[in-house]
Amino acid sequence: MLINLNVNPEVRARNVKVCKEKGIILPTFKQMVDPSTVPASIKEKLAKTGLWDVNPVNLFRITWKNEPVMEGGGFGGVNYIEIPRQLTGVKPRIFALVGKYFPTGAHKVGATYSCLAPALATGNFDAQNQQAVWPSTGNYCRGGAYNSALLGCKSIAILPAEMSKERFEWLKTVAGEVIATPGCESNVKEIFDKCHELDAERGKHIVIFNQFEQFENYLWHYTVTGSAILEVLKKLGVKPENVRGYASSTGSGGTLAAGDHLKDVYPHLKIAAGEAKQCPTLLRNGFGGHRIEGIGDKHVPWIHNVKNTDMICAIDDQDCMDIYRLFNEKAGIKYLKETVGLSDKQIEDLQLFGISGIGNMLSAIKMAKYYEMDEDDVLFTICTDSSIMYKTRLAELDEQQGKFSEMEAARVHSGALLHQSIQDALELTYYERLRVHNLKYYTWVEQQGKTYEELNRQWYDRDYWKSIPPMAAKIDELIEAFNKEVLA
């Protein structure tokens, strides 16, 4: 079983007691997909609760369907935007799910909950006596620390020292411990090394929830993110043959699982995995540092279904930083309004893009150009977080590169967006996919204790990946039984 659902009755009973004392109810996957099924009593509490409040009721806001407000919102449709063609420069329509309206301002709170909730409901994590460790390149440890705080668990957040100031400042208010590891976004091995060190020091007193290897992360995005995109496609009335592509950065491998769900429904759909050009691990077995915060690198996540990936897009981190300035600097906004002709609403929507979301958009643009898609075609991507997470980067960029002018805005719009090329975009053959898959060996078998046999199962066993989605229903049964005891 790829997700441990064995029950430890003694620890489970303690977790029930903790949740009963704190009045904590756990949402099911069904409720995260369709929050209209959330009890009225919960909805009443949410109406009086801020989106980021450290209040257990906010567990029920782990959904793509939150009302897009910061205070007291209810539920509605899926939060998404269409990226204007004046920006993409391509014929097909490109849509993006919006992560800003999750608690913590990023969808990673979903993956962390999906890892933590089954462990609580089965007793594989002791909320009373153990610390939850959240290794991350940014948003995952924020989500983990937040969910831990909601559930009254002690937490340890681990992330690279060069991540944005906003991440560290917020974590200090929520996490029990914050550990900065050496390096930047792509220094994932250093995070793993710190986990091994903590495991040796603290042993049974901690549980490490590693997003790069836990299939609960894959399951959440397959089930919740994939369902959200399907719902939007239905609302838009897109013909099946015109659902052409899904683009997401590799990161932990989680968001790519939504593409697997889409491909199960639309078998012709192409999935593009994005990464930084400055660290082209998938494209060239390469390495290096980069500035696209939140997408990791230098390894292939254990939970990445590489055999189902059709394309690799390596994105220049300078393009991402330039476009972030275009969307957020006064000169950029003026140019977009007066020269490009975007409406006030379209310009406001650009604030929904964080740096990794911009990278995802560029992968979708490369994909559209590579496959010569037309006006009837549709692609989907993800805005993991929003611009609010990176405002201090603007001052840093001003200092490094000088003030952003309208001339710079024109250069970025023309170059990084309208003339984004298909260079560093690779359509994968069978053996190129296998080459990428085999890179897992060096991280996961040699360093992290996985087996050669399971690595081969991921590639050759047709039931391996298909066994994961049905586990959502099994976890829901465990959560419902747990909640029943909490409410008894």
What are these regions (language model features)?
Residues M1-A488:
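PLP-dependent amino-acid enzyme catalytic core
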